Swiss-Prot record:
Name the UniProt record assigns to this protein: Adapter protein MecA
GO molecular function: protein-macromolecule adaptor activity
NCBIfam families: PRK02315.1-5 (NF002644)
One Pfam family hit: MecA
GO BP terms in the entry: establishment of competence for transformation; negative regulation of establishment of competence for transformation; negative regulation of sporulation resulting in formation of a cellular spore; sporulation resulting in formation of a cellular spore
Keyword Transferase found: no
Subunit text: Homodimer.
Amino acid sequence: MDIERVNDTTIKFFITYKDIEDRGFDRDEIWYNRERGEELFFEMMNEANDRDEFELDGPLWIQVHALDKGLEIVVTRGQVSDGNVKLEIPVSQDKENTDENIVDLMTGHSSEDDEGIDTDQLEIVIGFNDFEDIISLSHNFFIDDLENELYHFEGRYYLHVLFNDDQYNEDEQDDMLSQMLEYGYETDLSIHRMQEYGKEIIGEYALKHLRGHFPQN
């Protein structure tokens, strides 16, 4: 990882995806798993403090650029005076692109990921220890208009489920989720990771199709 001290309040990192993986992180989970994203960020900031005595205190302005070979991250520390925060932010030559890439790394995703996503909708990826567990679920869960897709990833099966708030209230969603988790387990995997690295087995209404093709033992 390269660390460049821009000025007294700003520091720039460049970390390759290989370096991220060598540190024990997955290049996708840092965006979609808040806890892991925070862990990587604080690890980088601790290294910056050790090398350049850049202390992590006060409000931070974080700018992230996802490049072909890694991430470029610019961190500017705000100066608090009389209750007011002053930020001396370096001006990028590509102002428009910079504005679009201003993200809060702690949220675990970029601002671009929010476009077109209804944040009120509950979605989850459920993992299964055995394929038979999914078959059993399909024969005991009969809400066929619930959006769900089946994926295979790293030797296991996963069901992505999307709840429509227009169809089901919060209590109904919780009840359905509880039923499904009797046969599987909740994961922190994202649908984006499933789509990119996994294999789609059934693209829509997976449980309904499984029930029709596989008899229950």
